[in-house]
Amino acid sequence: MKISREVPVNAYRAGEGFLPAYQKLVREVVIPYQYQVLNDKMEGVEKSHALENLRLAARKNRGEEVTEEFYGMVFQDSDVAKWLEAAAYTLGQHPNPELEQEVDGVISLLEEAQQKDGYLNSYFTVKEPNRKWTNLQEAHELYCAGHLMEAACAYYEATGKDSLLKIMEKNADCIYQQFMENNTRGYSGHPEVELALMRLYRATGKEKYKELCAHFLDARGQKPNYFVEENATRGWDVWGTHHDTVDTDYTQSTLPVREQKDAVGHAVRAVYLYTAMADMAGESGDEGLKNACHALWESVTHRQMYVTGGIGSTVLGEAFTVDYDLPNATVYAETCASIGLIFFARQMLQLEAKGEYTDVMERALYNTVLGGMQLDGKRFFYVNPLEVVPGISGKAATQLHDLPQRPPWYACACCPPNVARLLSSIGSYAYGEGENTLFVHLYLGGEVESSLGYSLSCETEYPRFGKAKFTFHGEKKTTLAFHIPAWSQKTTLSVNGEEWDLAECAKDGYAYVDRSFQEGDVVELSFDMTPYKVYATSRVPADTGCVAVQRGPMVYCAEGVDNEGDVLSLSVAEEGTIREEPYNAQLLGGIVPLTVEGWRVRPTQELYSRKRPEQEPVEIRLVPYYTWGNRGENQMRVWLPET
């Protein structure tokens, strides 16, 4: 069973610091920008049509003649849902009448687009009204429903308004009737509804939604495989090309969920499924699910994860491949996949308080997720490469997906609103509550109101710097549990100036401060931010003979703009010293640049030569990976040869 739960998103109030600044960016720039994009009001940006699709569905429901066509991906509704969820979290912490009016307008539109029986999906209402529930493999009906359920729960939890919750309860009841009462076989080709049903269950207290989630989990991967049978009989395809065989790895349906041990197939689908499995394991005490989650966690994070917290090695199926296949230039590492990995990590933390889950959460958040958005909040990466060479990246047939710069939007725009909803709800990832214990997973400035009868405020510039100061408000005999990152070689913790022995109070990556707290008590932590070299196991062929550099949870990279335009000729000296430069508030939003001693070889004109290249000593300048691509198109590398 669960040993903790996330705090409600409204329990955290942002203060000053690194992540609160990102929350402000999402609130002031990202959410308004994305609303304009969803309304097709942004010039020079890929057309969305997502809200217009819902307007067309509403008109059809009113019996009006609709000559316009549905536009976009079959899952276009989910872009609206994720934007709604991000807006909901923002409204809960920062009331904004204009934004609330926009949100309520979208909710009214969803109500008009919903059919009398609760069915809600603009693609099928507008384009394929006679083919509902006939293509679960491809058509994302349940996926879109899941995202809208999450938005509904978020809006209810953040504002207390239940208008969207009522709409999505009606939709969930429609799905329940279809799959439980009418005994329709099947489950979603793209997992998402499962984790959403667990949220809906907790928001409403209705057991039927948990029951429906369990049904979908239990049905997945059973023989005969549902997708194989559906594919043979349905007679139509979303993407226009019919395949006689079904990639069951891609749809996460090769094996029943309790028998899964290796992460395979589409990376986002995988971690969304694992999130639901871990959630259900915690709610029901299902040891089979819990054991599967442990095996899958190890498969992902010990053998198939990039140093940046990216997952999914290939563009072919946006998928995992095999253990230790982690190419840097042809990588996929979708932003949504790292977000899903954070979802999975949070659920695993609720099963057991182990620092390795939080370490991965940090790795994914501070590198790939933040790197998935331009510093101005208006451009986004779908794919997150670890090596970029303009002229090859985004151009060569094998690297069309690895772009050297972030576009302002995508035809398939799942990632931009996903980043927004994660960052706007980050407080519920930062803190968890157990029995008389408040867990501090992530360090961010602000204050959290605990249901245990006290509040805790935090002052920190983490992860730029390695100090965090917590002040206790109230009087309570309780336990505060602080994450101790594995990368910190020397961590100190003091209470009211008196240092505690971590050997006595720390376990599995958490330091437990158990005492009778008084108003104004101060807990201070200091982490060792000394930058260091990282080496991959020799099982990873792409990184053989190479080194990466990390400071705190942030991986660094070399960009051409800092290194004479060429990082391909650089290598790090084996005994080279890494040096921290002073914090530069004016550079890339405020960073601590690094330099490392190394070498540069001078390129020759010949493609191949007997002559050994000449080399000269250089200082290689490094910046945090999440900041790359913000200064124009240029080369970038995370892993550099070591000589």
Positions of predicted regions on the chain:
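Surface-exposed beta-strand/loop patches in extracellular or lumenal glycoproteins
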Residues: 471, 476-485
